């Protein structure tokens, strides 16, 4: 399979929620319809995924979004046999992420704050089972090399059909 580089529209959206209640802070932050900041890769050199809990029970979530043109991949009718997403690690050597299907960005329009929950299956009270997982949980992260994430059948089928 050829190497495909993400489009220039990729980037991150984060939501930083201040002064939220102790019992509902995480859910409110995770379920927010919009982010408080967004950066495209052309503007901001790093993207990432993180969740941070401040001492005041304030949560901050950053989600990275990537767009790929997979039209040049020649797949048999039953889809690609294997596919690997490679992301170069920079800082923070811990991981607890899952690659999921998103509806934004596309290859011509960059990421914006309103794209925070542009995740296939998202609704105002979503949980992990509502999303379309493209990988198993990633539990380790290399901060000075490419991290290879094996994409599952759902991702490979979408690569062949989109």
Each language-model region and where it sits:
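Short beta-turn/strand-loop junction motif enriched in small, turn-promoting residues
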Residues: 70-73, 88, 156
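Beta-strand-rich interaction/scaffold domains
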Residues: 90-161
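A near-ubiquitous, low-amplitude feature marking generic local secondary-structure context
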Residues: 47-53, 84-86, 132-142
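Flexible, small-residue-rich N-terminal segments that precede or flank a structured functional core
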Residues: 1-72, 105-109, 119-123
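Hydrophobic beta-strand residues in large extracellular and virion-surface proteins
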Residues: 4, 49, 85-87, 97-102
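Extracellular/lumenal carbohydrate-interaction signature centered on repeated Trp-anchored short motifs
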Residues: 59-60, 70-82, 161
């Amino acid at each position: 399979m050829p190497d495909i580089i993400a489009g220039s529209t990729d980037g991150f959206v984060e939501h930083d929620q201040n002064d939220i209640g102790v019992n509902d802070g995480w859910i409110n932050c995770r379920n927010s319809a919009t982010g408080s900041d967004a950066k495209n890769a052309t503007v901001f050199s790093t993207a990432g995924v993180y969740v941070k809990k401040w001492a005041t029970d304030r949560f901050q979530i950053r989600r990275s979004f990537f767009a790929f043109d997979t039209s040049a991949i020649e797949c048999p009718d039953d889809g690609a046999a294997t596919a690997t997403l490679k992301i170069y690690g920079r800082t923070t050597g811990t991981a607890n992420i899952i690659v999921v299907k998103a509806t934004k960005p596309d290859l011509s329009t960059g990421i914006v704050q309103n794209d925070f929950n542009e995740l296939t299956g998202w609704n105002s009270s979503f949980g992990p089972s509502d999303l379309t997982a493209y990988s198993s949980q990633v539990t380790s992260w290399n901060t000075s090399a490419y991290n290879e994430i094996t994409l599952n059948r759902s991702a490979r089928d979408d690569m062949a059909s989109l």
